[in-house]
Amino acid sequence: METFLLILLMLATVLASSVIDQLVPKVSSPLIQIGLGLAIAVVAGRQIDLLFDESKLFLVLFIAPLLFHEAKEAKKTELWRNRRSILSLAIGLVLAIIVAVGFFVNAMIPSISLAAAFALGAALGPTDPIAVSAASKDADISPRCKSLLKGESLINDASGIVAFQFAIAAAMTGAFSPAHAIGEFLLEFVGGIAFGLILGVIGNGIVRLVRSWGLENTTFHVLFEVFTPFIVFLAADQLGGSGILAVVAAGLVNVISPRTAGPSVSRLNIVSTSVWRVISFTLNGIVFVLLGTQLPRAMQTTWSNVAISNWTLLIYVLTISLILIAVRFVWVLLMERVHHRHVAKRNEKAAKEKNIAPEPRKSLAHDAHSAAIMTLGGPKGTVTLAVILTIPQAIAQRQLILFLACGVIVVTLLLATFVVPILAPQKKRDNTEQLERDVQANLDILRIVIEELSARQTPETRAATRIVVRQYNDRIKRIKELNGIEDEPNMKLRLRTLAWEREFARNLIETDEVDRFAGY
């Protein structure tokens, strides 16, 4: 009964946070929920500790469905286009952070062994996907930066967790085999992705099979979709792969609705979107409330320790945060410079073939600004805390390590909440932009009405529904014509046609078939 009451208390807290978020829009909802979690810790005491007795339980219960939904909603083409940069951040940067934090913490605090310091660095490697999404809402971040941050947060959990496990094993046994570690890492990384893709394809096959039998049941499809991440995580984990990566891979290939349109498809999309919106909001809130409830437990012992001053502890936290920021900034800056150099060479080659002026290269200041946004826009969060709380009691300076990790979580969340919007402020929209937003809102409303009408269509109302839907489509067409809105394929074709006309005119001028004045 007490556990049930605690669950109700957390749900009520999430509900309250949604109201407070509207009253205090400048403070991100994760920080509000963490603050409310701190208050719950005083009321609930140690009861919530049961959720963190086993980090795998936390991962499968909360992180798995959230990552599955994030991957399902992610823009696959952007992720694939930026795959090299995402893998660089999710694997290379995590390893760089492990090495930098490990050696620095061991040198700064000799009582923490090198292996334990590496474990701390591994726990601090992953970014929090929920906090990343929250930080992106309050800042004007470029599409590429958003894609990189989201893609990184989907993958780097696995690399950080695997590295953490090896570091803890080395700290406990005093032995470390690089060959064994690399083999295990490849098994978990590649195996997790492979298992996720296979299970995702199997899930799609099951849905298509049920659909082929004529069982167009919305309840079955939505429940099957919600059920999928838990099964994928547990199956991949039992097979030796990374459950986190398996869930992400399954989400990326998840296609629960068919490509053809129809009333049943519209109904399925509406229900699925609504269900996932509620699940995502609730789990996101509970995750950060739980994070708030765990901070006092993780930090109280070290904070009250008379053997080390509180000022020294704060200096340790700020120094480690600075190391993390510096390593991440340098890595991202170099990555962006290399990326834009390749893009510039490709553009120059294409411009030379078409005999047009190439686009100017991105400046160092531009890349430094983007790197600063991406550096502070990747805060640490629940995965870091869930992993660091599993450090065995036998590890020397365990409480100090917990304190340092929790302190860095708070610092990075504060920076993401208050500094990123300053670096990338949302642009003030003029009347033209407001008008465009209003027009787009009208179009969205009309499309939703069409989808709802199709979802509620019955055999008796089919003919009438088609007439009304045709009228709404005509309204959409008129609004587009009045406001000069074109669909993306038409726009691309028009731009391509203009490019051909310009190139043809330039050739006529160069061959003196027409004079320069007439050509231009």
Regions found by a protein language model. Name each.
Residues 1-433, 511:
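Transmembrane helical cores of multi-pass secondary ion antiporters/exchangers
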Residues 432-520:
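Cytosolic C-terminal regulatory domains/tails of membrane transporters and channels
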